[in-house]
Design a protein with these regions (language model features):
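Extracellular/periplasmic juxtamembrane helices and adjacent flexible linkers that interface
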Residues: 26-42, 55-56, 299-391, 414
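Periplasmic-binding protein-like
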Residues: 137-146, 224-230, 238, 275-305, ...
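Ligand-binding pocket segment of bilobal, Venus flytrap-like solute-binding proteins
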Residues: 209-284
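Von Willebrand factor
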Residues: 384-498, 526-536, 555-559
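VWA/integrin I-like adhesion module and closely mimicked acidic/polar interface patches used
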Residues: 405, 464-467, 501-554, 560-563
């Protein structure tokens, strides 16, 4: 217990310092510094993937901070490793974590990086304050689009029966949201590139000007009200583009629209159609669209790996690698066109009856604003424009939490809910957020609520509650369900369960009945640490279309931020 408590405290300190690693969902890892793979076979784990040349021993190894979306182009990376003779270890994380690593001199969580590969150049522009990044160049592109289930797109008048979509203005999207005809899932703009890029594109298009977003634009109340009206359509948030795609694929009857990379809409459609479901149609906003340019750049720390980097970067531009990029749904041609449009497998990705438009004219790409404006835009999003969150924190105060365990969790709640601490990670509460604390042990306590950014009383209650008794997560969850808002569509709502032990099961059936009757399909995310039972938590996640965050090792503070990215 003491070891776990110390780990929590270290993690919270890391969050307060703003140096956090966000685990990318998707590829599965060996350890924070990569691993030794067999020749020509990517070695996988949930955070790290290592590629070694198939021809024999590597001439060098590059440690790369990579966006988690790059797991989908593993075949292209392997081709480049084979051709260059250079091994690479991709450490998957969010684009904002890559930015933070650059701000820290190419170091994060004790790991040093030789290169960065975020989803967009804007994270290099914002994070490379020490001017370490050299020779950054795009590896491929993919626009951020709406993926809308075919019958819904036809109903909205945005597509015909063949799957061909029509130009849709951002104001048309607002009208569909306002009328109640469109709801969509989208990643958090402060935690994920796809969400941030889409948000910037919406705001830029709604200015009506053919120029980058400005600080004055962000202070315009009319623009703010339009963007807020559009974001009211978000019915599920996420901190990961990959996880968002997987959620939609797993629940096609529950989620019929998402904002995501075109490449992930393509991947989703391959899975949906194989399972006998209708595809999502790609809808490209006609007055402004963001494009992920996926740049790879060398982080010059004096480590003398520039030649190896150049070989690998050049190999990524080879025919073999570019073909694999396009087969995975990325674009490699000038202006967002395809280089290998005649390839049969590329054609199976870029299908017209999925609404995919490979003509460059379909991409009215916005110009990104200055880094300072992006920073301001993300702050305005978090504090004023996003749909408010309604979060119920169900927290374990059983006897095993006594001492450092309790203090660590209390400090973690402060890191997530104290406005000044949370601001460092762009997760600070807005004036309309609602947070509710439900401590539990053998039984659940009465809830403590906090409205807006005034979370002091809730945090005080968390600090003053003494650990004692057993572990009964189900009573805590039933009490949380009773606290769900009647106007649930006005919020992005979630229950967050934190536990360090195996639960008593006497109230399990009651919880399941309560969730079926009143849970409204809302997610119950779990943070698992100590001796928590993953079987129990996985069952809850499966029931509620959520996920379990593993805080048993590594940076637990990052988990707090990651959870808020999903809410």
């Amino acid at each position: 217990m003491s070891t776990m408590g110390k780990r929590i405290l270290r993690a919270v300190a890391a969050l307060a310092a703003g140096a956090m690693m966000l685990a990318g969902s998707g590829c599965a890892s060996l350890n924070g510094n990569g691993g030794n793979g067999t020749n020509g076979t990517p070695q996988n784990s949930d955070k790290v993937q290592t590629f070694t040349p198939s021809g024999g021993k590597a001439s060098a190894t590059l440690n790369i901070a990579s966006g988690s979306e790059n797991r989908e182009v593993a075949a292209a990376v392997q081709k480049a490793a084979d051709e260059s003779g250079v091994a690479v270890t991709l450490n998957y994380m969010g684009s904002l974590d890559i930015m933070a690593a650059l701000e820290n001199g190419g170091v994060s969580g004790g790991t040093t990086y030789d290169a960065v590969w975020p989803a967009s150049s804007m994270w290099i522009s914002m994070g490379d304050t020490k001017h370490l990044v050299k020779d950054a160049a795009s590896t491929s592109t993919t626009p951020i689009v709406f993926g809308i289930e075919k019958s819904k797109a036809v109903e909205l008048g945005w597509a015909d029966a063949s799957g061909k979509t029509k130009p849709v203005a951002t104001t048309d999207i607002i009208d569909a949201v306002t009328s109640g005809k469109l709801k969509f899932s989208m990643t958090s703009a402060t935690q994920s590139n796809s969400g941030a890029s889409a948000y910037l594109a919406f705001a830029t298009a709604l200015t009506g000007k053919n120029e980058p977003l400005s600080a004055d634009d962000l202070n315009n109340t009319d623009l703010q009200s339009k963007v807020a009206a559009l974001l009211k359509g978000v019915d599920r948030s996420s901190g990961s583009s990959d996880w968002l795609k997987d959620m939609v694929v797993a629940n096609p009857d529950r989620f019929d629209a998402m904002v995501n990379y075109e490449s992930l809409v393509i991947q989703a459609n391959k899975q949906l159609t194989q399972a006998g479901h209708d595809p999502l149609l790609a809808v490209y906003p006609a007055d402004g669209i963001a494009v992920s340019d996926s740049p790879l750049g060398y982080v010059d720390r004096g480590q003398n790996l520039k030649d190896a980097f150049s070989k690998f970067q050049q190999a990524l531009q080879s025919k073999d690698s570019k073909l694999e990029f396009e087969r995975a749904g990325r674009r490699t041609g000038l202006g967002g066109t395809l280089t290998y449009a005649s390839d049969a497998q590329v054609q199976q990705s870029f299908k017209a009856d999925w609404g995919i438009n490979t003509d460059a004219s379909a991409l009215k790409t916005i110009a990104l604003p200055a880094a300072s404006v992006i920073d301001q835009a993300l702050s305005v999003y978090q504090t004023a424009l996003r749909k408010p969150s309604y979060t119920i924190w169900v927290v374990d105060y059983s006897g095993s939490m006594k001492g450092e365990g309790k203090q660590g969790v209390v400090d973690g709640l402060n890191a997530a809910l104290n406005p000044e601490q949370a601001k460092a990670s762009r997760i600070e509460p807005s004036g309309k957020d609602v947070n509710i604390l439900i401590p539990f042990a053998s039984k659940a306590d009465e809830p403590v609520a906090a409205n807006g950014s005034d979370t002091a009383s809730l945090l005080s209650a968390a600090a003053n509650r003494d650990p004692r008794g057993g572990t009964n997560i189900y009573d805590g969850l039933s009490k949380a369900i009773a606290q769900l808002p009647s106007n649930v569509s006005d919020y992005t709502t979630a229950i967050v369960l934190m536990t360090d032990g195996m639960s008593e099961t006497g109230d399990r059936s009651k919880f399941q009945s309560d969730y079926a009757a009143k849970g409204q399909g809302l997610p119950i995310f779990s943070i698992m640490f100590g001796d928590a039972d993953p079987t129990q938590l996985d069952e809850i996640a499966s029931l509620s279309n959520a996920k379990v965050f593993d805080g048993r090792s590594g940076d637990l503070a990052a988990v707090f931020r990651q959870v808020k990215g999903y809410n």
